[in-house]
Every structure is written in structure tokens, then in C-alpha cells.
Amino acid sequence: QAIGPPYGLCFQCNQKTSSDCTEARRCSPFHEKCYTLYQPDENWMKSSGLSHFGCGKQCPTAGPEGRVTCCLTPRCN
């Protein structure tokens, strides 16, 4: 199973819908960038907000109160 271009290997889960974010999985072809999208909770506290881990062709854009980290390995997400 090839890892690396054109395939990435990233953590892919949403803390809101899944508590198991422990295993990186192969991304779709040419979705090589791993990202973590941080979103604040209902009280707008970033420290206790939820995270979405995924992979894409490019990094997603965070909303006004969120932030994104992005890289080429699952170590950053």
C-alpha cells in the first residue's frame, strides 16, 4: 500500500462524532495535506473547543473564531 504522493496518510475524524482519533488512515488520491481544524465550543472558548482532523488537496479555511494547522504528515494533526 503506497503512502506518499499521490496518497497522504492523515488522522481523519471529528471529535464531535467520534472519540477514536488514534489511527492515521490513507487519504483519497492527491489529498496530501493533513489538517486540524479547531472550532470554539458553544461558550466560544477555544481551549475547550472541538477539533476536526482530515486531509485535503489544500488546507481548509477556518471560520472567524477557528484556526487551522496544516502539514504533509500525520504528526501535525
From Swiss-Prot:
MF-aspect GO terms: acetylcholine receptor inhibitor activity; ion channel regulator activity; toxin activity
GO cellular component labels: extracellular region
Summary of the tissues where the protein is detected: Expressed by the venom gland.
Classification via InterPro entries: Snake_3FTx, Snake_toxin-like_sf, Snake_toxin_con_site, Toxin_cobra-type
Disulfide bonds: 10-34, 13-21, 27-55, 59-70, 71-76
Compartments, as annotated in UniProt: Secreted
Predominant cellular place of this UniProt entry's protein: secreted
Residues that bear Pyrrolidone carboxylic acid: 1
Gene3D superfamilies cross-referenced by the UniProt entry: CD59
Keyword Disulfide bond set for record: yes
One Pfam entry name: Toxin_cobra-type
Key words, A-Z: Acetylcholine receptor inhibiting toxin, Disulfide bond, Ion channel impairing toxin, Neurotoxin, Postsynaptic neurotoxin, Pyrrolidone carboxylic acid, Secreted, Toxin
SUPFAM superfamilies registered for this protein in UniProt: Snake toxin-like
Family (UniProt): Belongs to the three-finger toxin family. Ancestral subfamily. Boigatoxin sub-subfamily.
UniProt function note: Potent postsynaptic neurotoxin. Displays readily reversible competitive antagonism at the nicotinic acetylcholine receptor (nAChR).
Protein name in UniProt: Alpha-colubritoxin
